[in-house]
């Protein structure tokens, strides 16, 4: 599902299919809180110091979530089509984000404003379930990435990324892939060569 002309109804249906079965009325309510957004390549979606107020669903495009440490940019996450992203700590603490998010390609997003989503979740059990499953998924993805960085070799990290998100490997700049996998561009180059040799 990467059609940039998708309607809010289409997106509501896809979210329901992925996270929680919904009645027709619940789909109407979920559709009503969805906010369409478009970003050009290079646009900031969330700036450092802004408070994250939305959960985002990528319809089309590629986004990068990153932060600065000791003056160096570090990529924490990248999202392609049919993927949720957010600055989760900022979203829940309602504090300025230490992370930044920007579009690496022309990007179409539907946003779920946290306050509106929580308001409708109070009265709609299936939307409450959707909200909980989205948050669970986000935390699990973060934990798996942290475990991969702790326990996997550079080659295994790259193999896992190729298997789990081949589109990301094809579309994201190599410098960001290297940062996401916590290796230098030179190490990534060697790892990519080793992975190609394995296929032959």
Regions from the PLM with identified roles:
Residues 11-12, 138-147:
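Short, Lys/Arg-enriched N-terminal segment that forms or immediately precedes the first helix
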Residues 152-200:
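Phosphate-/nucleic-acid-contacting segments
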Residues 45-50:
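Short phosphate-coordinating micro-motif centered on Lys-Gly-acidic
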Residues 1-35:
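Cyclic nucleotide-binding regulatory module and flanking cytosolic helices
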Residues 42, 53-64, 81-82:
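Glycine- and acidic-residue-biased ligand/ion/polar-headgroup-sensing regions
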Residues 35, 62-67, 84, 108-109:
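Short beta-strand segments in beta-sandwich/barrel cores
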Residues 74-132:
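Cyclic-nucleotide recognition modules
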């Amino acid at each position: 599902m990467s059609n940039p002309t998708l309607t809010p109804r289409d997106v509501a249906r896809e979210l329901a299919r992925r996270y929680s079965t919904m009645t027709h009325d619940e789909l109407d309510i979920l559709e009503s809180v969805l906010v369409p957004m478009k970003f050009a390549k290079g646009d900031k979606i969330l700036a450092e110091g802004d408070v994250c107020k939305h959960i985002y669903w990528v319809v089309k495009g590629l986004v990068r979530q990153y932060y600065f440490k000791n003056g160096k940019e570090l990529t924490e996450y990248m999202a392609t089509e049919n993927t949720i992203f957010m600055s989760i700590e900022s979203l829940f603490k309602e504090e300025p984000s230490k992370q930044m998010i920007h579009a690496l390609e022309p990007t179409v997003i539907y946003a779920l404003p946290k306050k509106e989503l929580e308001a409708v979740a109070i009265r709609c059990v299936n939307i409450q379930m959707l909200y909980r499953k989205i948050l669970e998924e986000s935390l699990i993805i973060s934990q798996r990435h942290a475990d991969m960085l702790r326990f996997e070799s550079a080659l295994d990290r790259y193999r896992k990324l190729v298997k789990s998100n081949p589109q990301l490997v094809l579309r994201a700049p190599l410098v960001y892939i290297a940062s996401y996998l916590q290796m230098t561009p030179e190490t990534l180059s060697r790892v990519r060569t080793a992975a190609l040799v394995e296929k032959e």
